[in-house]
């Protein structure tokens, strides 16, 4: 029997680092299946009111070269991330952000960074499905039920999340294959993390495939097995990922920074690029009709009143 997931969030103040819009909060998401609720404590960002949403002047500085002190680079990255998040936040108007991409592409890691700097809440749709059906892993859900059962519950979770605001959601790798899921995600902004298959296969081979049911198969060469299966999945899902509002290519980021390997990129590098792509998307659609165009017009009206 399909489990139906209902989401309810209750926030309460907690001790954070610093003060003002960046102060952290603790949130609680309650997933109810039938009559048995399961509670999970989630780390979320702090609120961002009109003052926090007002963008700063565009930032055109470049990060320090990789030859400089690593601490200097970290400070540069943090400042750029903060400045860019404040610019993007002004135009989001509370709309959710959905990260899509292949398994192992870093969606959860990048989503947490984006949620922190935007003052949004973070959710992992796979974790919510696990809580909804009362099982510890996606692999076990596939084993004891089926992929179709998992996909049904995944759609239910995305449906419930789509009714909320100010979320960054890391979706499962296969969430894009169902058109109804795009209906839910299009209520917000979707970002595709496009990672080369070779890099994905190396990552997955290092950590193992036990938690990834579509890849878990006996093999004397984990890399070859992972690359083969990932290639097949990419062929099946490539067009679906391209439906995203913005594409973040790790190869392009690496090339701009002079790297020959995407593994040299930091999650912050990727998060900054995601914010740039989101900003490009919303500004390019500022004159269009529909939800995104209405979003920009409303943001521009609020900015005019604030001046």
UniProtKB/Swiss-Prot annotation:
Its main location: plastid. One of its GO terms (cellular component) is chloroplast. Coiled coil: none annotated. Keywords: Amino-acid biosynthesis, Aromatic amino acid biosynthesis, ATP-binding, Chloroplast, Kinase, Magnesium, Metal-binding, Nucleotide-binding, Plastid, Transferase, Transit peptide. InterPro entries: P-loop_NTPase, Shikimate/glucono_kinase, Shikimate_kinase/TSH1, Shikimate_kinase_CS. It catalyses: shikimate + ATP = 3-phosphoshikimate + ADP + H(+). Pathway: Metabolic intermediate biosynthesis; chorismate biosynthesis; chorismate from D-erythrose 4-phosphate and phosphoenolpyruvate: step 5/7. It is an enzyme of class 2 (transferase). Mg(2+) binds at residue 108. Substrate binds at residues 126, 151, 173. Induction: By chitin oligosaccharide elicitor. Binds 1 Mg(2+) ion per subunit. Residues 1-60 form a transit peptide. GO terms for molecular function: ATP binding; metal ion binding; shikimate kinase activity. It is found in: Plastid, Chloroplast. Expressed in panicles. One of its GO terms (biological process) is aromatic amino acid family biosynthetic process. Its cofactor is Mg(2+). Its EC number is 2.7.1.71. ATP binds at residues 101-108, 212. Residues 285-307 are annotated as: Disordered. Catalyzes the specific phosphorylation of the 3-hydroxyl group of shikimic acid using ATP as a cosubstrate. Belongs to the shikimate kinase family. HAMAP family: Shikimate_kinase. This is Shikimate kinase 2, chloroplastic. It comes from Oryza sativa subsp. japonica.
